[in-house]
Amino acid sequence: MALLAVEGLRTQFATSGGTVRAVDGLSFAIERGEVLGLVGESGCGKSVTSLSIMRLVPPPGRVTAGRILLDGDDLLDKDAEAMRRVRGARIAMVFQEPMTALNPVFSIGDQIAAAVRAHEGGGRRAAWERAVEMLDRVQVPSPRERARDYPHQLSGGLRQRAMIALALAPGPQLLIADEPATALDVTIQAQILDLLRRLQADRGMAVLLITHDLGVVAELCHRVAIIYAGRIVEMAPVAKIFEEPLHPYTRGLLRCLPHPSRFGQPLSSIEGAPPDLRQAGAGCRFAPRCPLALESCRRDEPALDERRPGHFVACPVVSV
């Protein structure tokens, strides 16, 4: 049994301009110890997927269909109190911008200690020592002193390390990392990614990595799911995505990557724009931008089929 199985997930936002189908029938699974990358353009539904799993979708959004199974236990059936016990202890999340995720009026150590006590009990002193230990494990220098600091007193890189320490302190089985290094400079970004890789290997936990950066995926992930306009269009082991991409959208994304062999040449781009999810009709949502689209692509929604062992693609046109 997979650690996490998402089946037919649909999350919608009711707005004055219509219903936004941000996540529209997503299905995927994550095995224990696996790192799965969820990749796509801004606005494709990556972060809404993670918030749906955590049951943190803000109003006016709501999950309208599907199942989210954690060890076979459907999270959508849990009440608010039961879900609070799941968050942190079994699933934790590292947010893209820790300055808005951390509480500005409590010290870093107090926030980590509070998470430890909420899920494991124990006294204040033991929880504080655990907080210092976690800051040390994520390579925060002078962890005992930094534990007394407030979020605004730390640099962006140290805040992200503190956010990781807070997420991992209760020992979750699954970590959701939503663009964990996007807001950081390149050097600090590399350090954070290396830290995540080491912690994942040491703890053997599963990770859902949400990103638009294919370079990050190549470094960290075992498998990758490519999402477009709220639907998964391709899913495969990471090496297969880079070496033998099948879906036209995946191929387009890879062509957009800068490469030394194309120095001095214009960067490639995917023509057109993503669809308005309030008006997305039948058929493949990439069809208006796809150079291979047939009339049937605009009419019929393609199924995500296994074309090769472990390699799934939602496109009737591509051949293998």
Predicted regions and their residues:
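Conserved ABC ATPase signature
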Residues: 149-154, 158
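Hydrophobic anchor residue at the start of the ABC signature
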Residues: 112, 164, 188, 192
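P-loop NTP-binding/switch modules centered on Walker-like glycine-rich loops
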Residues: 41, 55, 172, 176, ...
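Conserved ABC transporter NBD signature motif
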Residues: 63-74
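Short catalytic/signature loops enriched in Gly
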Residues: 19, 60, 141-147, 235-320
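A short, flexible loop at the N-terminus of ABC-type nucleotide-binding domains that lies
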Residues: 3, 12-25, 56-62, 79-83, ...
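Conserved ABC ATPase "signature" region
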Residues: 73-74, 125-145, 173, 254-255
